[in-house]
Design a protein with these regions (language model features):
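C-terminal domain-boundary segment and adjacent tail
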Residues: 28-31, 62, 228-268
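Histidine/acidic-residue-rich catalytic or RNA/ligand-binding cores of hydrolases
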Residues: 108-115, 193-198, 228-234, 262-266
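His/Asp/Glu-enriched short active-site or ligand-binding loop at hydrolase and phosphoryl-transfer sites
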Residues: 165-211, 248-259
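Active-site beta->alpha N-cap acidic-glycine motif
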Residues: 27-131, 139-157, 231
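Active-site-proximal beta-strand/loop segments in catalytic clefts of secreted hydrolases
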Residues: 40-43, 65-69, 99-103, 161-164, ...
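Bacterial N-terminal signal peptides that target proteins for export
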Residues: 1-13
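Bacterial N-terminal signal peptides
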Residues: 12-23
């Protein structure tokens, strides 16, 4: 038990103790009123650095879904030139899933059990191909292999279909090789790929702040070729600040109740 001397010195000590205790209490973080799960898909990569810097400034963790996409630099997002970027995000504690290596869009399930797919990049870009479940797994695992080669880290057993286009057979194929599919909440659609002429950044920000709730998964991109007024420079920082003011915290999908057990089981 702490004791204080008598007289004026005692009063001074008590005052000092009160000030210190008050400062400690003020410095203690407020309890989270809910958690938002930020996710980013690869894209043109035009906003990749800005997004990483903004997350770092807010001490916010996110989950990134990776495909080998053409970037504004003329390279591809899983080329060795992007290794420092991905390594830095790994070191900061973010999570990572596969978005198919060639950014492959699902078309439809076929009667023979195969899935009709259409790669955006790679040797079969623009062509419709019929894949078996194993070929789907191979495509998902290409990202895991490249990610490990670039960073030395292991990809999380999560994936997201490009465009969110998912068929029953495609979902089953991903699950068969250990990947859980991740979509996003209705309010979590950032709108960063919508035309800025009709969907202004101010409108998208207001919509997100009004609609997001505890447990929601947010989906945005590291850059969109078609949007004239980029989303991230105008929206991301005020979005995170606004959510923080509402008492929300941010976490990766490793902590999401729908995925944490799956991830733990796949890690065993």
């Amino acid at each position: 038990m702490m004791t204080f001397p008598a007289g004026p010195m005692r009063l001074a000590c008590l005052l000092l103790a009160w000030i210190v205790a008050g400062n400690v209490a003020a410095a203690a973080p407020a309890a989270c009123k809910g958690t938002i799960y930020l996710t980013f898909d690869t894209g043109s990569q035009s906003q990749a650095t800005l997004i990483a810097d903004t997350l770092r400034r807010h001490h916010a963790k996110a989950t990134f879904f990776l495909a080998n996409e053409k970037t504004v630099n003329g390279d591809f997002s899983l080329d060795p030139s992007w290794a420092p970027y991905w390594k830095a995000l790994v070191a900061e504690g973010h999570a990572f899933g596969t978005h198919t290596f060639d950014h492959v869009y699902a078309q439809r399930d076929l009667p023979d059990g195969k899935i009709e797919m259409k790669p955006q990049f790679g040797a079969q870009a623009g062509k419709k191909v019929a894949w078996t479940g194993q070929q789907v797994c191979d495509e998902l695992n290409r990202v895991a292999t490249r990610f490990h080669a670039l960073t030395g880290a292991t990809l999380d057993p999560l994936w997201r279909a490009p465009g969110g286009k998912l068929t029953p057979q495609l979902r089953a194929a991903g699950a068969a090789c250990g990947y859980a599919h991740v979509g996003w909440a209705p309010a979590g659609f950032s709108g960063d790929e919508l035309p800025s002429q009709t969907w202004s950044n101010a409108k998208l920000l207001q919509q997100s702040l009004a609609g997001l709730k505890d447990g929601d998964i947010v989906m945005a991109h590291l850059g969109i070729w078609s949007r004239k007024d980029p989303w991230a420079p105008a929206v991301l920082d005020p979005l995170l600040s606004g959510l923080e003011q509402k008492g929300f915290c941010f976490a990766t999908l490793r902590d999401h109740p729908d995925y944490r057990q799956h991830i733990a089981e796949q890690r065993r």
